Regions:
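Short, small/hydrophobic-residue-rich motifs at membrane-helix boundaries and re-entrant hairpins
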Residues: 11-27
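Membrane-interface extramembranous regions at the lipid-water interface
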Residues: 1-6, 22-101, 116-147
């Protein structure tokens, strides 16, 4: 079987999966926390649904759902709290990440697209974490609309 043998290959595969899985778990936890910080009536998707991102292949499509539903939930929550925010918060960079991941399967474009997808994923993650931190701030008494 060569120099490292079957056991060595198995160990390398486990290490590789761990390297990929650990950041994904922290990413999902960030998404879940951001959704939990939205009022239940503003959650377009259940916070637990973020864990569907852990399913290989399915996550290629679920990423689009997560990004669009997260943007809708955040937009509704920021509107409820009367906090000014961009329309569909995080949606553009999130969709760029999802599209670049799919483009990573195209021969010759694969490596540059995967690198760009990694950058967009990190930017999206940081952006959602920032929105989540904003929502974690104590809720000020909302002014009543003037009738």
């Amino acid at each position: 079987m060569g120099l490292i043998g079957l056991t060595g290959i198995f160990i390398l595969v486990l290490i590789g999966l761990g390297i990929l899985l650990i950041p994904m778990i922290f990413f999902i936890l960030t998404m879940q926390k951001a959704l939990r910080r939205c009022a239940p009536e503003n959650q377009v998707m259940s916070p637990g649904a973020a864990w569907l991102m852990i399913i290989p292949v399915f996550n290629l499509a679920w990423g689009f759902v997560l990004v669009t539903q997260m943007a809708s939930s955040l937009e509704r929550e920021f509107a409820r709290r009367r906090i000014p925010v961009e329309p569909a918060p995080g949606k553009s960079i999130g969709l760029a990440w999802c599209i670049l991941v799919l483009c990573g399967f195209i021969p010759l474009l694969g490596i540059p697209c995967v690198i760009a997808a990694l950058v967009c994923w990190i930017l999206y993650w940081v952006k959602i974490a920032g929105f989540s931190a904003t929502l974690a701030a104590p809720l000020q008494a909302l002014p009543q609309p003037v009738a």
